[in-house]
Amino acid sequence: ALVTTAFVSGTVAPASAATKLKIAHIPKLGTIGYFQAADKGVQRACKELKATCAYKGPTEITAAAQVKEINAAVQSGYNVIILAANDKDALVPALKAAQKKGVTVVTYDSDVAPAGRSVFVNQASSEGIGNALADSAAELAGGEGDIAVLSTTPDATNQNVWIDFMNKEIAAKYPKLKVVATAYGLDKPEESTTETQGLIQKYPNLKVIVAPTSVGIVAAAKYVSGSASKGKVFVTGLGLPNDMKTYIKDGSGAQASLWDVENFGYVAAQVANSIINQKASVKVGAVVKSSKGDKGLKSRTVTKGAVGNEIILGPATVFTKDNVDQFNF
């Protein structure tokens, strides 16, 4: 039988019965707009829950930098860590140590091995994202030709899973598409621009660059838009509408899609509260009712994902020149 649990805002349970949350939000890198948008959702949830929240953004996109933030959060008395992981396995020892000290760990955006957290809040099914990237690349390439990938780091859990599913979908559905290379821009604009330029120079027949990263897609689209490759090489992937608006509307043919990033952070924080204050089950099969501030689904079923148990945020929105002005994040 399914186990029914619920998200809880601070007004549901008596204040005396609720554990006061102290939440450390640790993104992959503190300066990335995507994670700053997610933090707005974390802060919105914290206001509802009367929780203490802090954005603990690392200055480097490495596992080592996140381990420092994890350890510092534990030492400072935080009882919740919301984490977008830079590495699937390297963070687990520090996270297990945190859990032994009573810290609840919820991952979102990019997961760790299940031993390091309670549950993963996934933006969408990894297979669905990979398939959508393949479909977009095929559309822009006209169903055949060379395409390349511009990712973040070689160790990025979520990007690696999406790319794997994308490659499988291309092999099965688009045999005339050829993925010629995967480059890594480290989620830094300068490095991503350099890698974009390198891909175009090395592969003169390149038709599409797929960038499943909010930093990489902007760097690639900006470079292509201002180069002789405009109208010849097309960029698609995952990006914020405010960042991609110019390139979607300027005739360079860029595409982008993304989920509600602000709500992403909100849901992750509310899941943590449910685990702590409602003893919510996050085992596969549990049905989690959404809190009133959730802008997505009315309930979410905990499912088995690529790594372990996960909660799906909801479907992504494809941003086009016709709808991109309707979004502001």
Positions of PLM-derived features:
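Flexible loop/hinge segments that line or gate small-molecule binding clefts
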Residues: 52, 89-128, 139, 146, ...
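Hydrophobic alpha-helical segments within soluble ligand-binding/sensing domains
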Residues: 66, 121-147, 161, 191-193, ...
